[in-house]
Amino acid sequence: MRPSPALAGGGRTVANLLSATEWMLPSPATQVHTISVLPSHSPPSPPHHFAFSNLTTAPKRNGGKGEEEGRPRFEVVRDDLLHPLANGNKARKLDALLPLLRRRGATDVVTCGGCQSAHAAATAVHCAEWGMRPHILLRGEQPDIPTGYNLISLMFGNVAYASRSVYAHRDEMLYNHARKVAGTGGTVLWADDISKEDFVLDEDNGCEIGSRRVVIIKEGAGDVQALLGVIRLVEYLYNLSSFHKHENVHVVVDAGTGTTAVGLALGAVCLGLHWRVTAVMLADTLERYKEREKSLISDFKKLCHNNYHEMVGENDIGDSLVEWVERFSPRRFGKVLNGEIALCRQIAQQTGILLDPMYTLAGWEQAVDLCVGDSRTKVVMIHTGGTLGFCGLAQRYSSHFTSDEQT
């Protein structure tokens, strides 16, 4: 493993923090696929003017040379393959958090999300795996036919539905539900309230035997401890031989809560890497994302106490690490535009990689634009998973899912 640049100085580094952390995932390893961007030979109008080839999995022709030679390309970090049901950045954000909660004596976990929330489903699955009872609050009404992530949440967790008016006050809703779960003799704790010492010390949780200890995880796992799993991913990528020769690395990720983007940027800073992180804003305004970034960085500094400045050394550039950008076709969150499902189908058929039009397609389009515009930079897209969301989309946009004859 390559030593981090700050390690040579003898100070405490992020590597020390990561090595002292218990993880949910057995390994940070993930597949990285190389995608070649080709001019399209088919007639569809822009923006569908590219074709794609997966150079990692496609058979090599002509001794490995062909029309892909010299074409723009980018890397896709296949975190969608981490787990059959609960993968992507949803698993990364729980990587350090769930073992910590179990060690702290958590018996139950409460979180929330939309009806097809990948985060809620991931929390339900992984909590069940780790012996904690998951309680999931989903926005809206129960669908007539449970499918996709809604079905996964129902199978692994204890699901309740909240009206949109109640859901609008998330913190109050989560706390009230957690109090009901805890009962008269139980305790309720927010995940963000667990201090840095909890990462290195086993403590008596002070609960009565048999009582419930309920921990609340924010919507989308936007908690400071979620950053560590993402930073662990950055360290893993940094140590891959394919990344060694590239000083200029540009990482692209779609942003829901923005936590993953901040974790990627913090990981790069703490490891002394001159990586750029661009996040495609999908669910909020630029001002809100910047506020969340500032808050997460502040919480991370508190988590590390006096060790934060030793970790980042001269690399600290304040509270603005992420480049937040609009999606190429901005829209109200959750809306799918004409042609986007067809584009996801095209990409799946040409590369074997399934994207969803609400999240990962936005990151893919950004990565394509960057690699076409700058061949000197290694462009890396983080696949954040979420592909089971297609099950819900197929119900909402049934006319877009047809068995057209393939040519």
Swiss-Prot record:
GO terms for cellular component: mitochondrion. Residues 39-72 are annotated as: Disordered. GO terms for molecular function: D-cysteine desulfhydrase activity. The keyword Lyase applies. Disulfide bonds: none annotated. Residues 1-34 form a transit peptide. Its EC number is 4.4.1.15. It is found in: Mitochondrion. Catalyzes the production of hydrogen sulfide (H2S) from cysteine. This is Putative D-cysteine desulfhydrase 2, mitochondrial.
